[in-house]
């Protein structure tokens, strides 16, 4: 079957619609099961009762064709178009209506080899569907819990601000040592609450992204696999029902061969394709959470660390997060390896759709579900720890020591985390920073911090449709490798110098490759895009590099011979995403200069997807322009 088709990639945040669609298809099995049981009885009475039964199920098919094909709430009405499975079912009913008589053996065969198997198929698929639904509910509950934690942190912060304001008023009225001490204590408590609130904002945003770009698509693809497994099993049973009728004679055999030819065209991917086509919708990602100052204590989004007291609290949090992260790293890597292997097996099955084995496919689906559920939970926990580490390390001033070597976690109250890394388009680091320390980015130039409120838009790596020729072990695994989260302590001899912190390999033409040890000079500072233009004095190249991979001293200026307007900020790097293509199934002649002509069989590279207008922007034979989305698959 087609490995490129993925409901999770194409239809965002559509669990309810997809789950209902799969439920309709599983309930449909009961209709088909009942059909064969009734058919077994009617075979004894020959053609008259058999013809009546066929008519009855023609009517049932007519009423369920739309929800089975495109779901209950399609965004585009299908008209007279039916799913391949429904078309195959229609052909079977037509051929059944032409059979005028039968005998007891055929009745027995229908009862034992078809109806009972359909009943068993419904039971096991329904159990799997329930398990997937539980998996989804668990993810939703975890997301909601994290949102609730954010609300609680906000409430605690507001209360701390109010208490601080009251203490300040008392001190203003009576400026004595006792009130001064109370004021300092309340200010420290307020700062702690603020830091916790900022951490929860980070975690909520990252969890939100992970949920919509990784977790939900994973569940949708599992639902897709259940429905496709249903199609595979159903095809086998239909073919079995046809084979027992072949023994009745040449005429019956001839009619059933016609039905078989349609059933064999019922590719699981065709049923998925028509559902996707008629349920595409304009979906907008929910907005990021942002810091909201207390109404009684106006402040900004920066961490509050005016003294070592707040730092000590953050060091404890950092130690706990590092401990959690390290304990979960091996688990997630082992689970990811298993998922990659299963994904490769599933991909190979789907690329050979004509010869796929339903049992093997379903067994792979079940095994994948058993692994992905704990993997997702562990990865979410790891993300919480990772975000907490990043939030603390990137926001504490350099003069404070964040070393956690002397922190005994056994003497502190343990708190469980609920976060893991999610799928985003951060560029891979080819060489990790040294682990010589974790006190900051250096004692020299300013610490470059990626603002909590200026994060670039993330995308779910490996989830876009792949070209047919691609074969990646990690195809559709919604995760990314996590870079070492500890910052590197720089030698004091490097103070005031520009420096390469981490290695980076060029991905686009306007970028350059850098390696720790290279001498660099500033050309244009970061304008907020996360990219800085530099000159690599070692290699002589000039281009963009990630701002967080280098350190530019506060005294650095743009080279005189390179002065001029700041270069245009390049778009977010997406070079790790596979190219998406579409195949033309109908001819179209361009009607304007902004369109391109296509012929059946043309492979078109998608540059910009359909925005809901019915048109896609792509490139074919070197020409770029718009073409009708519905003319391609």
Swiss-Prot record:
Span of domain SH3: 493-555, 577-633
Region named Disordered: 429-495
Keyword Membrane annotated: no
Coiled-coil stretches noted in the UniProt entry, renumbered to this chain: 138-210
Start-end of Low complexity biased regions: 474-493
Phosphoserine modification, residue list: 327, 463, 472, 476
Purpose of the protein: Plays a role in endocytosis and trafficking to the vacuole. Functions with type I myosins to restore polarity of the actin cytoskeleton after NaCl stress.
Name of the protein in its database record: Protein BZZ1
Organism listed in the record: Saccharomyces cerevisiae (strain ATCC 204508 / S288c) (Baker's yeast)
């Amino acid at each position: 079957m087609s490995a490129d088709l993925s409901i999770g990639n194409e239809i965002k945040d559509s669990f309810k619609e997809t789950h209902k669609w799969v439920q309709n298809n599983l309930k449909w099995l009961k209709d088909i099961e009942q059909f064969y049981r009734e058919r077994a009885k009617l075979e004894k009475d020959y053609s008259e009762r058999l013809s009546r039964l066929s008519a009855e199920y023609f009517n049932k098919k007519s009423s369920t064709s739309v929800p089975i094909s495109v779901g209950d709430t399609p965004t585009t009405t299908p008209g007279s178009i039916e799913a391949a499975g429904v078309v195959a079912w229609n052909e079977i009913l037509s051929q059944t209506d032409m059979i005028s008589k039968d005998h007891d053996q055929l009745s027995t065969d229908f009862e034992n080899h078809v109806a009972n198997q359909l009943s068993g198929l419904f039971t096991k698929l329904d159990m799997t569907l329930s398990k997937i639904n539980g998996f989804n509910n668990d993810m939703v509950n975890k997301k909601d819990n994290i949102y609730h934690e954010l609300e609680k942190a906000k409430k605690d912060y507001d209360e701390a601000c109010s208490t601080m304001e009251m203490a300040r008023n008392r001190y203003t009225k009576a400026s004595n040592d006792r009130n001064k001490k109370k004021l300092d204590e309340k200010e420290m408590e307020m700062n702690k609450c603020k830091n916790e609130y900022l951490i929860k904002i980070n975690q909520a945003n990252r969890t939100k992204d992970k949920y919509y770009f990784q977790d939900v698509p994973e569940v949708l693809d599992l639902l897709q696999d259940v429905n496709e497994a249903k199609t595979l099993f159903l095809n086998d049973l239909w073919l079995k029902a046809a084979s027992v009728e072949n023994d009745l004679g040449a005429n019956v055999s001839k009619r059933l061969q016609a039905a078989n030819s349609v059933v064999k065209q019922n590719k699981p991917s065709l049923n998925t394709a028509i559902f996707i086509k008629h349920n595409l919708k304009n979906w907008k990602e929910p907005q990021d959470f942002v810091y909201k100052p207390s109404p009684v204590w106006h402040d900004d989004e920066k961490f509050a660390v005016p003294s070592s007291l707040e730092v000590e609290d953050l060091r404890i949090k950092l130690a706990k997060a590092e401990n959690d992260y390290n304990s979960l790293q091996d688990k997630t890597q082992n689970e990811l390896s298993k998922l990659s292997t299963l994904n490769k097996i599933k991909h190979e099955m789907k690329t050979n759709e004509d010869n796929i084995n339903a049992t093997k496919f379903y067994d792979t689906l079940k095994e994948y579900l058993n692994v992905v559920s704990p993997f997702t939970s562990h990865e979410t926990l790891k993300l919480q720890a990772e975000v907490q580490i990043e939030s603390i390390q990137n926001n504490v001033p350099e003069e404070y020591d964040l070393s956690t070597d002397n922190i005994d976690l056994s003497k502190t109250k343990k708190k469980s985390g609920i976060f893991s890394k999610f799928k985003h388009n951060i560029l891979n680091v080819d060489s990790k920073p040294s682990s010589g320390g974790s006190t900051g980015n250096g004692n020299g130039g300013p610490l470059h911090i990626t603002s909590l409120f200026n994060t670039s838009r993330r995308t779910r790596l490996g989830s876009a449709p792949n070209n047919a020729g691609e074969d990646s072990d990690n195809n559709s695994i919604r995760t990314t490798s996590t870079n070492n989260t500890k910052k590197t302590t720089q030698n004091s001899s490097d103070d005031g110098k520009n420096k390469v912190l981490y290695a980076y390999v060029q991905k686009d033409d306007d970028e350059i490759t850098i390696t720790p040890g290279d001498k660099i000079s500033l050309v244009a500072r970061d304008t907020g895009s996360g990219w800085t233009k530099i000159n690599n004095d070692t290699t002589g190249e000039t281009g963009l590099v990630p701002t967080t991979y280098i350190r530019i001293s506060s005294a650095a200026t743009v080279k005189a011979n390179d002065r001029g307007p700041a270069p245009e900020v390049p778009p977010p790097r997406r070079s790790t995403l596979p190219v998406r293509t579409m195949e033309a199934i109908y001819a179209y002649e361009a009607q304007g200069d902004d369109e391109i002509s296509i012929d059946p069989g043309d492979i078109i590279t998608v540059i910009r997807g359909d925005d809901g207008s019915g048109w896609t922007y792509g490139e074919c034979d070197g020409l770029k322009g718009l073409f009708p989305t519905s003319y391609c698959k």
